[in-house]
Regions:
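Conserved N-terminal beta1-alpha1 strand-loop-helix module at the mouth
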Residues: 1-41
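Short, well-ordered coil/turn segments that N-cap beta-strands
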Residues: 3-7, 35-38, 63-67, 92-94, ...
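Active-site mouth loops of central-metabolism enzymes
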Residues: 7-23, 45, 67-79, 132-150, ...
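Conserved, mostly hydrophobic/aromatic
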Residues: 11, 39, 88, 158, ...
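Short, acidic/polar
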Residues: 18-31, 53, 78-86, 146-157, ...
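Active-site pocket-lining/capping segments in soluble small-molecule metabolic enzymes
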Residues: 19, 111, 115-138, 188-240, ...
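Active-site-adjacent beta->alpha loops and helix N-cap segments on the catalytic face
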Residues: 19-21, 47-59, 77-84, 102-126, ...
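Catalytic beta/alpha-barrel core
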Residues: 39-49, 71-73, 97-99, 164-173, ...
Length: 278
């Protein structure tokens, strides 16, 4: 890797079982060897995984890593967010990922915060500059946005509210990211915009995720993945090459680093990162 020290970070989701929590620590140890900047931990809505998120944050912090817990608007009150912020600060947590979050089925209200912008603003009001705040960016447009320009304007509002850096939704079209960054810079946004990268491990699962979040899998990739059928080894080898090429183009194009959506697996992300270093 000839570029200057790109950043590296990983996302985990909180395991639902004690066995999963133990496995996550093993995954963490394997990825920690790559010297990432931090690990983010997702946050379940409505209490579904909130306790597990707190447990994962505690365990990963105790293992010596910088951890960035997710905060979401869904069901949150000013008091509940204030309690989380104070608790994380007491643990020495210095970074957060502030998101609107997805409404669970049947939920009609987000709570006291309607948008991630409101959440970012509240964190700054309550905690000053203690936390580095990451927010989401959508190179292929948020699925609920009315237009690319409206989506970019909303992103700029989050930055103006106090965000320090952004992580994108995953994508497989480098041009989408490069165009988004160019448009953001033209709009006066100067914070780092780090591409979020999802390894390709399972076509059915990836298709479901992508349909839900609005991420586009280019047609040529879909056709190749579908043609592998149950040949998972060949599918993953192809997926590895696709993502390595994507990351290489992104870093060459000026991306400040890579944020991996790990699905709590170390091997695929580590292999991609090592390939980029050759």
């Amino acid at each position: 890797m000839t570029r200057q020290a790109p950043s590296l970070s990983f996302e985990f989701f909180p395991p639902a079982t004690d066995a999963g929590a133990q496995k996550l620590l093993e995954t963490h140890r394997a990825l920690q060897a790559l010297q990432p900047e931090y690990f983010s931990v997702t946050f379940g809505a409505g209490g579904s995984t909130q306790a597990r998120t707190a447990e994962a944050v505690t365990n990963l912090t105790a293992a010596g890593s910088e951890v960035a817990p997710h905060l979401t608007c869904v069901g949150a009150t000013r008091d509940s967010i204030r309690e989380l912020l104070d608790g994380y600060r007491a643990q020495g947590v210095k970074r957060l990922v502030a998101l609107r979050g997805d409404l669970p089925s049947g939920t009609m209200s987000l709570g006291d915060f309607q948008h991630a912008t409101d959440l970012v603003r509240f964190v700054r009001e309550h905690s000053g500059d203690w936390f580095t705040i990451e927010v989401a960016a959508y190179p292929e447009m948020h699925p609920q946005a009315t237009s690319p320009d409206a989506d970019l304007a909303h992103f700029a509002e989050k930055v103006a509210a106090g965000a320090d850096s952004a992580i994108t939704q995953y994508f497989y079209n480098a041009d989408a990211y490069l165009d988004f960054v160019e448009r953001a810079r033209a709009a006066g946004v100067t914070i780092p915009i780090v591409p979020g990268i999802m390894p390709i491990l399972n076509y059915t699962q990836l298709s479901r995720f992508s349909d839900n979040c609005g991420a586009e899998i280019p047609r040529w990739i879909r056709l190749r993945l579908a043609a592998f059928h149950d040949d998972m080894d060949s599918l993953r080898a192809f997926g590895h090459d696709v993502v390595v090429d994507l990351c290489d183009r992104l870093l060459t194009g000026g991306a400040p680093g890579i944020h991996f959506y790990t699905m709590n697996q170390a091997g695929p992300c580590a292999a991609i990162w090592q390939a980029l270093k050759r």
